Amino acid sequence: MLKITIITLGNKMPDWVNSGVNEYAKRFHDGIQIKLIEIPLLRRNKSSDLARILEKESALTKDALPANARLIALDMLGKSFSSEELALKLTQLQQISSHLCFIIGGPEGLSNEILTLCDERWSLSKLTLPHPLVRIILLESLYRAWSIINNHPYHK
């Protein structure tokens, strides 16, 4: 069984975000287990020390990292994939690890400390995406790749 953990900074998402995440998570069949870990964003204002906030959020993220998982940071500068390339990549990763952990940063992205810990960096787009929407895009992309691997008609 493939385990997919998604660690994301930010909680208290709007209903439409939770609905989108739940919709794609339930589409995966018994062979894949999806787990979402939400880390609350620290309070920000105009006078906030963003470096200090990022450091604290990084510590919370590190504490949430599952042992023995392949860590994949979602980062604008990461590698991007077509749907077919992502299907091939997932097939290859399943040979390496039975647990993939995707990390979604907050408004400032991920700290260098977290990026350094990760085995890979992936990009979903060259666009700057709101981090709540990234959850849905990631799960849809993974589901599409899964459907390609399994010859499911979703991708067609």
UniProtKB/Swiss-Prot annotation:
- CDD domains given in the database record: RlmH-like
Question: Where is S-adenosyl-L-methionine bound in this sequence?
Answer: 74, 105, 124-129
Record field: catalytic activity: pseudouridine(1915) in 23S rRNA + S-adenosyl-L-methionine = N(3)-methylpseudouridine(1915) in 23S rRNA + S-adenosyl-L-homocysteine + H(+)
As for subcellular location, the record says:
Cytoplasm
Q: Record's GO cellular component, any one?
A: cytoplasm
Q: Which UniProt keywords apply?
A: Cytoplasm, Methyltransferase, rRNA processing, S-adenosyl-L-methionine, Transferase
Primary location class: cytoplasm
One GO molecular function term? rRNA (pseudouridine-N3-)-methyltransferase activity
> Pfam families, per this entry?
SPOUT_MTase
Quaternary structure annotation from Swiss-Prot or TrEMBL:
Homodimer.
Stored NCBIfam families: PRK00103.1-4, tRNA_RlmH_YbeA
Q: Which family does it belong to?
A: Belongs to the RNA methyltransferase RlmH family.
Q: What does this protein do?
A: Specifically methylates the pseudouridine at position 1915 (m3Psi1915) in 23S rRNA.
Name of protein: Ribosomal RNA large subunit methyltransferase H
- The gene from which this protein is expressed is rlmH
